[in-house]
């Protein structure tokens, strides 16, 4: 059965299905929208008590519900300049060292930092022998992504690709899953060196947005595109730890890359363990 499920991933019209779902999720359908939201809350056991607006009727579209804000104080940010915090409510998929330019996708499956970063060999070299973590956002999670530390945006890269579903089954069976799916790479300069925060798309992830640039995808491109940002001035993007940096409209995965000897992961990190945005993720070395 698993082989059939994975095989279907190669045959379904990934981009067409995602466009359709994106349009439906953005449609204002009144009572139908409310009914779908109520079903989703029940189906995935979504905690609406922590949402700024807990009544499903508040949301005009499903996407508005999906990227719902939380109440003030719902996610306190761990204090301390050396404390790096979780960027999202998620589940730890994999984490550890980047060895020979390779990241672990699942048992028996690796992928390269260079491919993840859109084929940029020079950029990948910055993270040689560094550390990585892959965090999977489930449907029930809060889908805004925040900064794990203070950072100044250096570059944003759009990398076109497939839209395979992202879950343990595909991670174990689809080679180079995270390096072949569509993604937006954000490179920040921090006190401990460069850090990458990569937002990876998936089937029915209708949109990836950034707070400084709005919607990056759709429309979906056919080639890698890069935006460079200044470190100072009106066009500089400087974000504090805990500030929102992006969001998924129907979610997927966040991958962080850290340079060599920059951080040590918090002792609470464990594959398969849920994460809470703002709690300790790693510590500067």
Curated annotation (Swiss-Prot):
Gene Ontology biological process terms, A to Z: phosphatidylethanolamine biosynthetic process
Known EC number: 4.1.1.65
Cofactor(s) needed: pyruvate
TM region positions: none
Modified-residue entries (Pyruvic acid (Ser)), positions: 252
One of the record's GO molecular function terms: phosphatidylserine decarboxylase activity
Catalytic activity field: a 1,2-diacyl-sn-glycero-3-phospho-L-serine + H(+) = a 1,2-diacyl-sn-glycero-3-phosphoethanolamine + CO2
Pathway listed: Phospholipid metabolism; phosphatidylethanolamine biosynthesis; phosphatidylethanolamine from CDP-diacylglycerol: step 2/2
Keyword annotations from UniProtKB, A to Z: Cell membrane, Decarboxylase, Lipid biosynthesis, Lipid metabolism, Lyase, Membrane, Phospholipid biosynthesis, Phospholipid metabolism, Pyruvate, Zymogen
GO cellular component: plasma membrane
Record carries keyword Calcium: no
Cofactor, how bound (note): Binds 1 pyruvoyl group covalently per subunit.
Membrane topology designation: Peripheral membrane protein
Keyword Cell membrane applies: yes
Active site (UniProt): 89, 146, 252
Subcellular localization: Cell membrane
Modified how: Is synthesized initially as an inactive proenzyme. Formation of the active enzyme involves a self-maturation process in which the active site pyruvoyl group is generated from an internal serine residue via an autocatalytic post-translational modification. Two non-identical subunits are generated from the proenzyme in this reaction, and the pyruvate is formed at the N-terminus of the alpha chain, which is derived from the carboxyl end of the proenzyme.
A Pfam family recorded for this sequence: PS_Dcarbxylase
Residues with site note (Cleavage (non-hydrolytic)): 251-252
HAMAP family in the cross-refs: PS_decarb_PSD_B_type1 (MF_00662)
Family designation: Belongs to the phosphatidylserine decarboxylase family. PSD-B subfamily. Prokaryotic type I sub-subfamily.
PANTHER family: PHOSPHATIDYLSERINE DECARBOXYLASE, PHOSPHATIDYLSERINE DECARBOXYLASE PROENZYME, MITOCHONDRIAL
Function: Catalyzes the formation of phosphatidylethanolamine (PtdEtn) from phosphatidylserine (PtdSer).
Oligomeric form and interacting partners: Heterodimer of a large membrane-associated beta subunit and a small pyruvoyl-containing alpha subunit.
Name listed for the protein in its UniProt record: Phosphatidylserine decarboxylase proenzyme
Organism expressing this protein natively: Vibrio campbellii (strain ATCC BAA-1116)
Lineage of origin: Bacteria, Pseudomonadati, Pseudomonadota, Gammaproteobacteria, Vibrionales
Encoding gene per record: psd
């Amino acid at each position: 059965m698993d082989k059939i499920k994975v095989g279907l991933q190669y045959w379904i019209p990934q981009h067409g299905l995602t466009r359709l779902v994106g349009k439906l999720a953005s449609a204002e359908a009144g009572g139908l929208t409310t009914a779908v939201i109520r079903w989703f809350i029940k189906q995935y056991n979504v905690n609406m008590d922590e949402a700024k607006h807990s009544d499903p009727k508040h949301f005009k579209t499903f996407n508005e519900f999906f990227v719902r804000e939380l109440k003030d104080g719902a996610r306190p940010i761990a204090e301390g300049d050396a404390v790096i915090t979780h960027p999202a409510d998620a589940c730890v998929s994999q984490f550890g060292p980047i060895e020979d330019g390779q990241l672990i996708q699942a048992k028996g499956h690796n992928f390269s930092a260079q491919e993840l970063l859109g084929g940029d060999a020079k950029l990948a070299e910055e993270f040689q022998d560094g550390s990585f973590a892959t965090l999977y956002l489930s449907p029930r999670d809060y889908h805004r992504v925040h900064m794990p530390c203070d950072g100044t945006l250096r570059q944003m890269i759009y990398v076109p690709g497939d839209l395979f579903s992202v879950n343990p089954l595909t991670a174990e069976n689809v080679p180079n899953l995270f390096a072949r799916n569509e993604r937006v790479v954000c490179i920040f300069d921090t006190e401990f060196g460069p850090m990458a925060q990569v937002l990876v798309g998936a089937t029915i992830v209708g949109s990836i947005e950034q707070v400084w640039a709005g919607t990056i995808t759709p429309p979906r491109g056919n080639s890698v595109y890069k935006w460079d940002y200044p470190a100072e001035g009106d066009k500089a993007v400087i974000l504090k730890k805990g500030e929102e940096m992006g969001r998924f409209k129907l979610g997927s995965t966040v991958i962080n890359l850290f340079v060599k000897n920059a951080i040590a992961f918090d002792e609470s990190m464990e594959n398969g363990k849920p994460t809470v945005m703002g709690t300790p993720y790693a510590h500067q070395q």
